[in-house]
Curated annotation (Swiss-Prot):
Gene coding for it: Gr58c
Family listed: Belongs to the insect chemoreceptor superfamily. Gustatory receptor (GR) family. Gr10a subfamily.
Segments passing through the bilayer: 39-59, 72-92, 173-193, 224-241, 262-282, 296-316
Key words of the record: Cell membrane, Glycoprotein, Membrane, Receptor, Transducer, Transmembrane, Transmembrane helix
GO molecular function, one term: ligand-gated monoatomic ion channel activity
InterPro entries: 7TM_chemorcpt (IPR013604)
Example of a GO cellular component annotation carried by this entry: plasma membrane
Glycosylation sites: N158, N203, N337, N386, N391
Name by which UniProt lists this protein: Putative gustatory receptor 58c
Role, per record: Probable gustatory receptor which mediates acceptance or avoidance behavior, depending on its substrates.
Annotated localization: Cell membrane
Length: 412
């Protein structure tokens, strides 16, 4: 019952922070759209978020021009920390407009999971828990950016004004952390859906392997026993292939719903990572109050944050590998089934034609250059794969090196 408890808690928190009005009914294994008063509560909370946003940004950045001790690097570092807050406008509008679509897709996914007995296993659960643990680095980084001694929030230009602003600044920091939680929920939801999809693909691949084993024990000579066995395998394959097509459509629709949020999250994370790595270099190179343990701690926090982003990409790469594994096993099934001596209207011939169509479909889906055959995953700009995250990492390092050279020329 652990998975039911975790799902129930997950959606309870999402309702508490006003992200959606979905409720998971563990007794019926489906999602329910809670209406009044849940909708009223969520709408009021979202309106409050929108109204508070400009005031929170002003409170957290209003001291930029009044901090004599804050250098340019420190100011930029603090302002970049707040860029993620601007994406919440896209997040909330998209989730609320498409909440009925999410409700339908979520129930379709739960049906597929329960058809395979909904036993996700330790690997899937551990992946989601590890992703959640790594996501906490976002909150640590934001808190560190807003509360360190050289932050704009802690500017000491006017001590009396600072004391008067402390309650408002504390409230603004809590607001910023809630906004990070909202955006983290989107990334986590996409990740959980992909993990569940990968688990379903593993079970479907196992089903194909069982068909291969059944086909191998059938008599080689054409006759009634072989024909009856082929009819059963053909019926099982049709059912399995419908589930494969449905799963492919579900995963694509989930990504389509959240693609703009994922795009803006990745864009702000890209800028965020450059600022964090550059700030780490500034601290190691120029800080007069340098402490080795602080440098190591900052490095660990940055690496944790970056690994969390890599996990977001790698789950899509794992999904591709699972489809490739399914493709290979379907090819093996076709090889064993194919025989030139079969009658045109036999179940074996029909199964071969069905398998050939499936092989063409998956080969087209899994081409190395997806631009030729389909839209890329995220707004038609790039694919979520290990290649993309490696390019992103190289770009981050390159930009930091360029900034370091500029800093040396200007301040070195």
């Amino acid at each position: 019952m652990n998975q039911y408890f975790l799902l129930h808690t997950y959606f309870q928190v999402s309702r508490l922070i006003g992200l959606c009005n979905l409720h998971y009914d563990s007794s019926n294994h489906r999602f329910i759209l809670n209406h009044v008063p849940t909708v009223v509560y969520c709408v009021i909370l979202n309106v409050v978020y929108l109204l508070v946003l400009p005031f929170a940004l002003f409170v957290l950045t209003g001291n930029i021009y009044h901090c004599p001790d804050a250098g340019m690097f420190g100011v930029v570092y603090n302002v970049v920390a707040l860029t993620k807050l601007l994406t919440m406008l896209f997040l909330m509008s998209s989730v609320w407009i498409q909440r009925r679509r999410l409700y339908k897709l979520g129930n379709d996914l739960m049906k597929m999971l329960h058809k395979f007995r909904f036993n996700l296993g330790n690997d899937c659960r551990n992946r989601c828990l590890c992703k959640g643990l790594l996501t906490s680095s976002r909150f640590v980084l934001l808190t560190q950016q807003l509360l360190t001694r050289d932050s704009v929030v802690n500017c000491e230009s006017n001590s009396s004004l600072r004391q008067a602003m402390v309650p408002y600044q504390s409230a603004a920091i809590v607001y910023a952390l809630i906004m990070i939680l909202l955006m983290s929920y989107v990334d986590m939801t996409v990740y959980m859906v992909e993990v569940a999809g990968n688990w379903l693909l593993v079970n479907m691949t196992q089903g194909v392997r069982e068909m291969v084993q059944d086909l191998e024990v059938l008599p080689e000579r054409n006759g009634i026993p072989r024909e009856m066995g082929l009819m059963q395998i053909l019926a099982a394959w049709r059912k399995l292939w419908r589930r494969c097509r449905r799963l492919d459509a579900l995963l694509k629709q989930f990504v389509d719903i959240f693609q703009w949020q994922v795009l803006f999250n990745l864009l702000t994370t890209y800028i965020f990572s450059i600022a964090v790595l550059f700030r780490l270099w500034i601290y190691l190179e120029f800080d007069k109050n340098f402490h080795l343990w602080k440098g190591i701690l900052y490095a660990i926090i940055f690496l944790t944050h970056h690994v969390e982003i890599v996990m977001q990409f790698s789950i899509f790469e794992i999904n591709r590998c699972k489809w490739l594994g399914l493709l290979e096993d379907v090819g093996n099934l076709w090889d064993i089934n194919y025989s030139g001596r079969q009658c045109i209207k036999s179940s074996g011939t029909i199964l071969s034609r069905k398998l050939e169509f499936s092989l063409l479909y998956m080969n087209r889906k899994l081409q190395l250059n997806p631009k030729r055959v389909r839209r890329l995953h995220i707004v038609g700009l790039f694919d979520l794969s290990n290649l993309t995250v490696h390019n992103m990492t190289r770009s981050i390092i390159t930009n930091v090196l360029v900034l370091c050279q500029i800093a040396y020329k200007k301040y070195g």
